[in-house]
Swiss-Prot record:
Keyword tags: Cytoplasm
Compartment list: Cytoplasm
Entry similarity comment: Belongs to the CutC family.
Entry superkingdom: Bacteria
Keyword Repressor on entry: no
Protein name per its UniProtKB record: PF03932 family protein CutC
Gene Ontology molecular function terms on file: copper ion binding
Length: 267
């Protein structure tokens, strides 16, 4: 279905009329879990890369070596996920020290921004810890990540994120996918009123990005755009549990498709 037909079906108006109300072009950030994924995102036309490790578990801070190589080879903005472990987003003082060290590495390597978030045991934004991390980032841009999706009150969290001076917030609307959380995302976009970018993420694909754009009013979208890469068969040795199996990598063609769809909906 073309974007024109989709907008007419949902809103009963032409694309031109709808876009006059939107007024801002749309772009794609790609979550990349390897050097190859980051380069595929760039090749496919992504506007920005969020570099991380272990996307299967929600993402962790990438290694220094990966970060250094990607920074050298990437020519589009590079943001880096700062998350020292899986699980919740309530961090200890020692974990804060680790995160500060990782942020400082990003500064030294010339990254464009960091992606982080911290909550207190009550589910509120840990303003003290966030201020320390943001201070360590200096002039780098800051995205508040999906900690908002498990916070006590997403609307209040959004106001705290704005007060901290973050550029954007990544959210699935508190659901397992952005499509399921579209109503909440739309409410956050309306509440933000241009004070911060609200960026839908989680399950964003070519099959739903137009619907998400229309339903949420968002202008930036976050996707991994991955395909399975078949493992090389090394000799006659059988696989041992999960060792040596297939793996995921960002697919430049999937990125191109998303970028093309967003461009159609913004031009």
């Amino acid at each position: 279905m073309s974007f024109d037909v989709y907008v007419m079906r949902v809103f009963g108006k032409s694309r031109g009329s709808w876009e006059a109300g939107m007024g801002v072009s749309a772009g794609l950030e790609v979550a990349a879990g390897s050097v190859a994924s980051a380069l595929a995102a760039q090749e496919g036309g992504a506007m920005r890369v969020e570099l991380c490790h272990g996307l299967e578990g929600g993402g962790l801070t990438p290694s220094y070596g990966m970060l250094a190589v990607v920074r050298e080879r990437l020519h589009i903005p590079l943001y880096v996920l700062i998350r020292p472990r899986g699980g919740d987003f309530v961090f200890s003082e020692e974990e804060m020290e680790v995160m500060c060290g990782d942020v400082e590495c990003c500064v030294r390597l010339g990254c464009d921004g960091v992606v982080l978030g911290a909550l207190d045991p009550a589910g509120e934004v840990d303003m003290g810890m966030m201020r320390v991390l943001i201070a360590a980032a200096g002039s780098l841009g800051v995205t508040f990540h999906r900690a908002i999706d498990v916070s006590a009150d997403p609307g209040r969290t959004l106001e705290d994120v704005i007060a901290l001076g973050c550029e954007r917030v990544l959210t699935s609307g508190g659901r397992s996918s952005a499509l399921e959380g579209a109503e909440t995302i739309a409410a956050l976009v309306a509440q933000a009123a241009g004070r911060v970018v609200v960026m839908p993420g989680a399950g964003v694909s070519a099959g739903n990005v137009l619907e998400l754009r229309v339903r949420t009013g968002a202008h930036e979208f976050h996707a991994s755009a991955r395909s399975v890469v078949a493992a090389r068969r090394l000799g006659a040795h059988p696989y041992i549990h999960d060792l040596g199996g297939d793996y995921d990598c960002t697919d430049a063609d999937k990125v191109r498709q998303l970028v093309r769809l967003l461009s159609q909906g913004a031009s």
